[in-house]
């Protein structure tokens, strides 16, 4: 009886492990970079106030980086 319980536990752990692993397609799709709105559409200047670099820096701070700046319309975050 104890062998059956151990075998059932091992099978259950293998099934749980296979269900918890991410699908390979999901890993590849997350690598694709998409353009950010902070440097393209939200770049504006009004009465001497330019919001392009500050919005990019805020975006980078929100994802845990140490700030950032716009370079050729792309937000580049510092490490």
Swiss-Prot record:
Pfam families to which the protein is assigned, alphabetical: Defensin_2
Subcellular location, principal: secreted
Claim: Kinase is one of the keywords in the record: no
Sections of the chain in a coiled coil: none
Alphabetical keyword list: Antibiotic, Antimicrobial, Defensin, Disulfide bond, Immunity, Innate immunity, Secreted, Signal
Upregulating conditions: By bacterial infection in fat body, hemocytes and malpighian tubules.
Prodomain positions: 20-36
SMART domains: Knot1
Positions of disulphide bridges: 39-70, 56-75, 60-77
InterPro entries in the cross-refs: Defensin_insect (IPR017982), Defensin_invertebrate/fungal (IPR001542), Scorpion_toxin-like (IPR003614), Scorpion_toxin-like_sf (IPR036574)
Database matches in Gene3D superfamilies: Knottin, scorpion toxin-like
GO cellular component: extracellular space
UniProt xrefs under PANTHER family: DEFENSIN
Protein name according to UniProt: Defensin
Taxonomic classification: Eukaryota, Metazoa, Ecdysozoa, Arthropoda, Hexapoda
């Amino acid at each position: 009886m104890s062998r059956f319980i151990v075998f059932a536990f091992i099978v259950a752990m293998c099934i749980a492990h296979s269900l918890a692993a991410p699908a390979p397609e999901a890993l590849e799709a997350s690598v694709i970079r998409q353009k950010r709105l902070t440097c393209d559409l939200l770049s504006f200047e009004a009465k001497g106030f330019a919001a392009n670099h500050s919005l990019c820096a805020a975006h980078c701070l929100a994802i845990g980086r140490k700030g950032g700046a716009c370079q050729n319309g792309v937000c580049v975050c510092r490490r």
